Amino acid sequence: MAESNKEAIDSARSNVFKESESLEGTCAKIGGYDFNNGIDHSKLLKSMVSTGFQASNLGDAMIITNQMLDWRLSHDEVPENCSEEEKKNRESVKCKIFLGFTSNLISSGVRETICYLTQHRMVDVLVTTTGGIEEDFIKCLASTYKGKFSLPGADLRSKGLNRIGNLIVPNDNYIKFEDWIIPIFDQMLIEQKTQNVLWTPSRMIARLGKEINNETSYLYWAYKNNIPVFCPSITDGSIGDMLYFHSVSNPGPGLVVDIVQDVIAMDNEAVHASPQKTGIIILGGGLPKHHICNANMMRNGADFAVFINTAQEYDGSDSGARPDEAVSWGKISSTGKAVKVHCDATIAFPLLVAETFAVKKEKASKVNGF
């Protein structure tokens, strides 16, 4: 009986204290930032990767983004048929970066972060929804205000106030937007009829970016720096409303916007990226996420990918899909580096930019004496 009891205890002990496989040298040790060392925001951000949970995912996103920014063609093996001139140019060939975001992020203060990236030519291709276009221009004309998520809709409606989460957009903003954009549509229609101009969403967006002529606008900088902005859903939102009112006010063939030419241009951004690698950073989900991923499928997947959103995968939505699902479609390379940060992008993205794009811009400015 005693022997049997000892065997049972030994078995229980063996089960509880199962010997571990060593993780030394293969995994990062968990530990957060020690504020006894003073306040150092850069070190705090660097500590995210070893903090755990979504902080670690954010830290991984910072690492992958820096890999996007640091990559040069010279890092890859030189092909046998490479000429001497091509060898010299390899150091100047950088990763092509696609940035996608949903409209609410332009409604929010993330707009200024995106404006910074376009102003300094840190991204190469932009994709957003219609709200991400119109809200940028509207903010040049009038302000958006901080409210509360709990404000009653009927009360706001009676006051001509529109709610986006905890943001408030006065309806007068859209009246100002109409006053600004309709004369531009008039001129675009004249050019379509007299000069056979073929308008596409990206061409229209560039024209509007030129017309706004405001340095607080990311679309102004995209126009100025020749960064293409794609928006397949251009007939949605307030711009769609304005296109409707403009078209019904102009009998006969009205303003025509050709979306097919833009899907060719968008896919070509990925198809003809080689020998560049491609990196994708997507804030939110929906159309921008799929449009960028689908274009990169044309080249058998992006080499780097960072998703930041709060959507879940359990309903089969593309918005909630993890990077590995995109790998199954060939939208992210099977050898690519990818991470999803489950976080509100208004929190995560400015922090990511602070430890990636902004740091490199500051270092470059010091080197160049600016």
Swiss-Prot record:
Gene3D superfamilies attached to this UniProt entry: Deoxyhypusine synthase (3.40.910.10)
Domain of life from the UniProt record: Eukaryota
Name of the gene encoding the protein in the UniProt record: HSS1
GO MF, any single term: deoxyhypusine synthase activity
Record protein name field: Homospermidine synthase 1
Enzyme Commission (EC) number: 2.5.1.45
Cofactor(s) the record lists: NAD(+)
The UniProt record lists the keyword DNA damage: no
InterPro entries assigned: Deoxyhypusine_synthase (IPR002773), Deoxyhypusine_synthase_sf (IPR036982), DHS-like_NAD/FAD-binding_dom (IPR029035)
Any single GO CC term annotated in Swiss-Prot or TrEMBL for this entry: cytoplasm
Phylogenetic lineage: Eukaryota, Viridiplantae, Streptophyta, Embryophyta, Tracheophyta
Quaternary structure note: Homotetramer.
Alphabetic keyword roster: NAD, Transferase
